[in-house]
Swiss-Prot record:
Sites of Leucine amide modification: 13
Compartment(s): Secreted
Organism: Vespa magnifica
Keywords linked to the UniProt accession: Amidation, Antibiotic, Antimicrobial, Fungicide, G-protein coupled receptor impairing toxin, Immunity, Innate immunity, Mast cell degranulation, Secreted, Toxin
Protein name: Vespid chemotactic peptide 5f
Transmembrane segments: none
Function in brief: Mast cell degranulating peptide. Shows antimicrobial activity against the Gram-negative bacteria E.coli ATCC 25922 (MIC=30 ug/ml), the Gram-positive bacteria S.aureus ATCC 2592 (MIC=10 ug/ml) and the fungus C.albicans ATCC 2002 (MIC=25 ug/ml). Has little hemolytic activity. Its mast cell degranulation activity may be related to the activation of G-protein coupled receptors in mast cells as well as interaction with other proteins located in cell endosomal membranes in the mast cells.
Gene Ontology MF annotations: toxin activity
GO cellular component, one term: extracellular region
Primary location class: secreted
Length: 13
């Protein structure tokens, strides 16, 4: 996942 467009996804993981 790209940390720029979807920073929320990284937080969930």
């Amino acid at each position: 996942f790209l940390p720029i467009p979807r920073p929320i996804l990284l937080g969930l993981l």
